[in-house]
């Protein structure tokens, strides 16, 4: 039709993982992106035009939020702030909040034990992690614009925009792997090291696994809904006087949740998950 014009564009970006995790044997830091854009221009009449634009983008891969971490272990600070330290090195548990939480959760035999040894890798393409990161993001934007010539000298422009964004990311927060067993507060009584089946994450993004060493994960969940509307009246008189008047409305709702969870935090959350719960129940 002479009074209707449309355009459609599509893109995709795919790449294999560039970093290898020897713990799981998997590669990560890949890319899997897809996007599209559709627009429609409709000449309703000689004085009225309508434009519709819709765009969407989705990413679903294993890209990290941060690539690597460096740390020079320090029993007070966790990581010595004066030195960069080694790559793929976790903080000393004795100077980290994870150590305190683990102590409260009875993971240590009396005093807090550093649960992370020396750096496991000195290569950027090889990192030892309990789990690879996950990245999922979906965003959509719809824009509607109506232009109408009220007269030869006055034009009205009305716009409305609606957009949403869902973002979910998980990371191995400590950036390394612990190989130190969780001796537990019951070690002096001859009880075996702690091992528990624990669930990490949120209602939007979670997993469960058997934990027999310390580990720290972080979870980011963001959901956004945005609405915008505006109307403008613009004059184009021949004389010295012209005007521009309008009204703008904006509404945004965002739920942003960030969690950091360790073996200790999950055991504190439910003592029934601790192997010591059966011991206490049997007393």
Predicted segments, located by residue:
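Beta-sheet-rich non-transmembrane sensory/scaffold domains
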Residues: 128-131, 139
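Face-selective signature of the C-terminal outer-membrane beta-barrel domain
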Residues: 138-166, 213-283
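Short acidic-aromatic active-site loops that bind/stabilize oxyanions
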Residues: 12, 132-133, 217-220
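Transmembrane beta-barrel wall of Gram-negative outer-membrane proteins
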Residues: 1-109, 141-142, 224, 228, ...
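Generic N-terminal amphipathic/basic segments
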Residues: 66, 134-137
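Solvent-exposed loop segments that connect transmembrane elements
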Residues: 19-27, 64-128, 174-219, 259-283
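Short catalytic/ligand-binding loop motif for oxyanion handling, primarily in non-cytosolic enzymes
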Residues: 59-62, 168, 254-255
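Short, solvent-exposed loop/turn elements at domain surfaces
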Residues: 121, 126, 166-169, 241
